[in-house]
Amino acid sequence: PGLRALQKWAVVLGGGTNHRRSLSDGVLIKDNHLVLLNHTTTPILTACRKAKANAPRGMKMIVEVESLAEVRQAIAGQVDIILLDNMNSATARQAIRLIKGRALVEVSGGITLKNVRAMAAAGPDRISIGALTHSAPAATLSLVLEPRRRSSR
């Protein structure tokens, strides 16, 4: 905590680039947001449409996907960046073929200095690798939202 600016500066000094400085740089739709739309058959497409209708004009739209079915929804939602989360290199390669230049592709999640070459060979536009900015082991923390169960009265 409190070191974000220094971490981003260190990436630049090391020859990397920071494509996002803060949450205000674009709309990022992640899995926890989609829980709120799980009643629809196309939650990613629905989220993209809602975000586009409410975001400032020209704001970048980024959506995190975990499967090829979700990639198809993101393509239909005409987002700017599709973030392939925790995909292996073979699935990432398939996803990149589906996207065919209709959005920038970023691979993220599970990328290490040991597997980054295999992921780069899949052909993404960007690779997000947290190993560049964290060296000390940290506790894994997450917030998981689950839909509220409706009573069957």
Predicted regions and their residues:
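Short secondary-structure boundary segments
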Residues: 86, 109, 131
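Acidic/glycine-rich phosphate/pyrophosphate-binding loops and surrounding catalytic core
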Residues: 1-66, 70-77, 81, 90-98, ...
